[in-house]
Amino acid sequence: MSSTHSTGPSIGIDFGTTNSSIALARSGAVELVSFPTAGGTTESFRSVLYLEQRKHAGRTQIKGFTGPQAIENYLEAEHKGRLIQSLKSYLTSRTLSGTEVFGRRYSVEDLISRILTDLRLNAERQFERPIRHATVGRPVRFVGAESDEDDAFAVERLRRAFLHAGFESVVFEMEPIAAAYAYESTLDHDELILIGDFGGGTSDFSLLHVGPGVRARGRTAKDLLGNSGLGLAGDSFDARIVRKLVSPALGSESFERSYAQAKDRPASIIPAAPAWIYANLERWHYLSFLKTRNVAEILKSAHARAQEPEKIEALINLIEEGLGYQLHQAVQRLKIELSHQETAEFRFRDGSMDIVAAVNRKEFEGWIADELRSIERCVDRLLADSNVLARDVDRVFLTGGTSFVPAVRRIFEIHFGASRVRTGNEFTSVARGLALRAQEMDARA
């Protein structure tokens, strides 16, 4: 039978919270899509959408950009539009069906489909054929999911977004299992492996048998011993950095002025600005929604009452000037530097803001201690539910940007031994595995 669909082969798409990538497997060889950037090309496409208003022929139009072009146009714009990050994190929310941008209503699926459309068009240009079928990664547990029903709801929203983007069929595969296929392609023997896939929004784990023998006899349900996941990863680590270093400089620990000067009356303990604003500041996918008239009025009032009005002014400037991306980059730089060295300096300077702080790795690991414990418990639960002892696992393969964090890797080195822990192609292994899985399914079609 034909090994491809009538409208071309299936491709593998890793639509991630922070980054996305696409790959096509042909005769066992995997080719990743390269995306143009101002400085050359990249195989990692930022999962961001930038919308702005432009005048054309006397009419105002809403122009959209995605990926590297979104960042470039956002940075060049004198008057910032809306930069929307981490859209994948909205998928479980039943209360957030969409948002209004420049007076036009967009559903979450509409926004995601804009990114997916550009991913598809880039793939079509490189492979010189129509792309209508995809094997798509999904986390074991979506951000915000509290039940299997929440995950199913998120999958259906994501499926609709793919259909809106011009795809005709979509097959979903667990992201850690996809990473396992990529790892399997390097083996000349069978192994029982634990895969840890750490993205921006989720940490996912799978325990399964892989190898040439497994492929030769044909995969069965018994080869997969278990999956486990939780809705925290790199973005959760970022939130801790924002809470510790950024929010206090923007007034999170500031209070209203006390008008009671008498000694027998306590000073004001009422926060100058509501806590939910700072909670949204910590989450990249909510940051763009702070730029509203309601928030502006709240902060104007807070500025008038604050003991430290200059901090509230800095917060207002951050929101009004749309500096979320610059803040995100500063946080990312600190996290990356602390993954490679013991100390680093956090720097975020823009206008009325001048935040500089020295941070050491031990201090950072203290900030993310709760998240690290959650990851460790998730792995322990997977082993227990699968009736597998740590010593029986042949290899641990870690992928995703957060796998670079030494404290994350240490969890697995302690449990399984450093010699059994491997990493590789941290940003593209899921897409590679999805492409191999797509080729495998096409061959059986």
What are these regions (language model features)?
Residues 28-159, 163, 240, 246-323, ...:
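Phosphate-binding loop and its immediate beta->loop->alpha context
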Residues 16-18, 43-46, 341-342:
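A short, compositionally biased
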Residues 18, 201-203:
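Conserved Rossmann-like nucleotide-cofactor binding loop
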Residues 198:
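Rossmann-like NAD(P)H-binding beta-loop-alpha module
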Residues 12, 61, 157, 345-348:
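Short acidic/polar alpha-helix capping motifs at helix-coil junctions
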Residues 2-41, 68-195, 209-236, 355-389, ...:
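N-terminal phosphate-binding loop and flanking beta/alpha elements of the actin-like ATPase fold
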Residues 215, 239-255, 279-445:
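Helical "lid/coupling" subdomains associated with nucleotide-phosphate turnover
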